[in-house]
Structures are given as structure tokens and as C-alpha cells.
């Protein structure tokens, strides 16, 4: 009896040691939005001004859109205060939202951007940037706006795509109009300002570097054209394009009230 029981126990132990799941692969670790980015292949642009289509990338990083909406963290509030927001601005910080999302850079790499918009438009705006990511529309840089200085220089060379910035609306000569810009409410976005410049009624631009983009028949990365997905996607959420203005044109500018 003892020998038989011992033999049976040995068989059970052998079976337990040899049995295994169908796969021994360790589970894929969860990746945070700040994981290392994937680098996509580069090449000539398409006729729509989009970056080249990539081969599937399965290494580190994300090849599909990822974005999130949050209240403005204290660290970002400190970064904004006395630069792009201050007491007396027409919208309170608690009425703004921080968007974090990945976007396609001009060299085909996937980057992580930050943008502050009004809470009421946050979900719609994030949806637009998801469409643009899927269509491979590239951005030079997406980040929080820089400080506005009255009569100071406007830097378009970095071509930063940005939204909220508490400042007045500007006349063609860059002097304040006395009313708030829609950027002050988080209800306006400037996209690739160098590639999509503000053009005065006399055809001049604010920076010599933008003159290379005055010919809007060109189809260069990051440029916005009539009927393009960028224009249609913003129109679908009720935002208007400055390229539709009569006289002056603000090709970079999208806003809820068309100002």
C-alpha cells in the first residue's frame, strides 16, 4: 500500500511539473503615455501635405493615437501664471483643461504634445487631433503657448502649435484692439504658424521666413489648404478657419467664434 501510494504521488508530481500553459510569454507591461517614442520611416510627402505612410512599428512607443484630458495640474498652473495666464483673465484656470496627446513630427517621429483649451471644447479638440494623427498630418511642435509681450516680437520660426494664451486681439500692426483674443478663452488654436502665416491685406507677413509659404499652391508638410482635413475636422466641431477671412488671411488660426 505504501509503495503504491508513493508511486501514484510521484506520477502526480511529474504531471504537475510537465504541464504548462500554451504560451510561456510574459505579459506585455503597461506603457504610460510618456513611454519612449517610436521612430517612423521618413520619405517624400504625399500630395496632401501629409508625411509618408509608415511600415508597422512594433518596437517601443505608440503607432496609434493616444491622448488624455485632465484638469490643469499645479505644476502647469505655476508654469502658466504670469506668462500666459494671470488674475483678471476672462477665464479661470479651473475652466481650462490640459490635453496631452501624441502627434506626428515633420521628420516622421511620434512626439508628445501639450495644449490648454477651454473645458467645454476639450473633447472635441482632442478628437480633431486624433483625426489628424490618423491622416498623418505633421506638426513642427505642439506645446503650451509662449508669453505674449505688447509690441514684442512674435516668434514664428519655431512654428509652435498652441491654443490658450491670455492676450488681447491684435490689429494688423500688432497693437492691441481692446478686446480679448479667443486664445484668451482657450477657444482658438494656431497650427504650424510658419507654414500657415498671417497675411495682411497688402500681402505682407510678420516674419521674412514665412515668405516661403506665401504661395499657397505649394503642398508642403504642415501647410493648410482649402478643403483639407484640418479645415473640415474643425468645421465639424463648429470652429472656423482664418483662411476664410476676406482681405487679411490667418492661415494658422482656428477658433470657435471665427475671430
Where in the sequence are the language-model features?
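Structured segments of extracytoplasmic/periplasmic soluble domains
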Residues: 104, 127-138, 167, 194-197, ...
Amino acid at each position: 500500500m505504501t509503495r503504491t501510494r508513493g508511486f501514484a504521488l510521484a506520477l502526480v508530481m511529474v504531471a504537475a511539473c510537465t504541464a504548462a500553459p500554451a504560451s510561456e510569454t510574459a505579459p506585455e507591461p503597461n506603457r504610460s503615455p510618456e513611454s519612449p517614442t517610436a521612430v517612423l520611416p521618413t520619405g517624400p510627402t504625399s500630395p496632401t501635405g501629409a508625411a509618408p505612410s509608415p511600415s508597422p512599428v512594433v518596437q517601443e512607443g505608440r503607432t496609434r493615437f493616444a491622448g488624455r484630458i485632465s484638469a490643469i495640474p499645479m505644476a502647469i498652473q505655476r508654469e502658466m501664471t504670469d506668462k500666459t495666464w494671470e488674475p483678471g483673465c476672462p477665464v479661470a484656470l479651473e475652466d481650462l483643461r490640459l490635453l496631452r496627446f501624441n502627434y506626428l513630427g515633420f521628420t516622421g517621429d511620434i512626439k508628445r504634445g501639450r495644449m490648454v483649451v477651454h473645458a467645454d471644447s476639450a473633447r472635441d479638440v482632442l478628437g480633431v487631433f486624433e483625426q489628424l494623427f490618423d491622416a498623418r498630418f505633421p506638426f513642427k511642435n505642439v506645446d503650451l503657448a509662449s508669453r505674449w509681450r505688447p509690441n514684442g516680437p512674435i516668434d514664428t520660426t519655431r512654428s509652435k502649435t498652441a491654443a490658450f494664451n491670455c492676450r488681447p486681439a491684435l490689429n494688423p500692426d500688432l497693437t492691441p484692439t481692446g478686446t480679448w483674443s479667443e486664445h484668451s478663452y482657450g477657444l482658438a488654436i494656431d497650427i504650424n504658424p510658419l507654414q500657415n502665416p498671417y497675411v495682411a491685406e497688402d500681402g505682407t507677413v510678420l516674419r521674412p521666413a514665412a515668405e516661403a509659404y506665401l504661395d499657397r499652391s505649394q503642398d508642403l508638410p504642415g501647410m493648410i489648404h482649402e478643403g483639407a482635413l484640418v479645415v473640415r475636422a474643425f468645421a465639424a466641431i463648429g470652429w472656423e478657419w482664418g483662411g476664410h477671412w476676406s482681405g487679411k488671411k490667418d492661415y494658422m488660426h482656428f477658433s470657435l467664434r471665427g475671430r
